[in-house]
Design a protein with these regions (language model features):
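An acidic, low-aromatic, low-complexity terminal/linker signal
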Residues: 1-173
Length: 173
């Protein structure tokens, strides 16, 4: 396996590999761009529900949800990526993931599909593949006429770890 493929495998939490050369991903849309995350990091996908705002929480935290008795912070990927924030629609979803031992949700415009792709079609992200920070991108998959941006959840939410802990503490108080 090439150094790039090793990096991608390590970047995708728990590696959603189906076979030696397959990745299994959940794909979704945010601000017209298609993204994907490793299916093994995804705990569930929910329709939008009412979020409870937490006083004095930072702007990247939209609020918290009570999911079967567990308080889960929810972030809006539009806000996180610096896109124009918009109201949720009937297609909006909350994707609940586990990242670095923390469970959190993030809002996406819509979920597309679960997809298996050959690891060989994934390349390192060019610097200007998207308007988001390339540090958050594990790679880019080329599927026919579309680009699939694979997110590195660990890096994407690492800066929010302390914020999330404070939000959870405030919500529990």
């Amino acid at each position: 396996m090439s150094e790039l493929q090793d990096h991608i495998s390590n970047s995708l939490t728990n590696s959603g590999e189906v076979g030696d050369d397959q990745l299994q991903l959940v794909t979704f849309e945010v601000a017209g761009e298609e993204f994907a995350v490793d299916i093994l990091a995804v705990q569930e996908i929910n329709r939008m529900m009412e979020l409870t705002r937490v006083p004095q929480s930072p702007p990247e935290v939209e609020g918290v949800i009570n999911l079967r008795g567990k308080i889960i912070p929810v972030l809006d990927l539009r806000n996180r990526f610096g896109f124009k924030v918009q109201e949720s629609t009937a297609q909006s979803r909350i994707v609940v993931v586990e990242v670095g031992g923390r469970v959190l949700g993030f809002i996406v415009d819509r979920v597309h599909e679960v997809l298996r792709i050959p690891q060989s079609i994934v390349e390192a992200a060019p610097a200007m593949v998207s308007s988001i920070d390339s540090d958050f991108i594990a790679g880019v998959g080329k599927l026919d006429d579309r680009l699939l941006i694979l997110l590195d959840l660990g890096r994407l939410f690492s800066t929010e770890a302390e914020t999330i802990d404070k939000t959870l503490a405030a919500a529990a108080a």
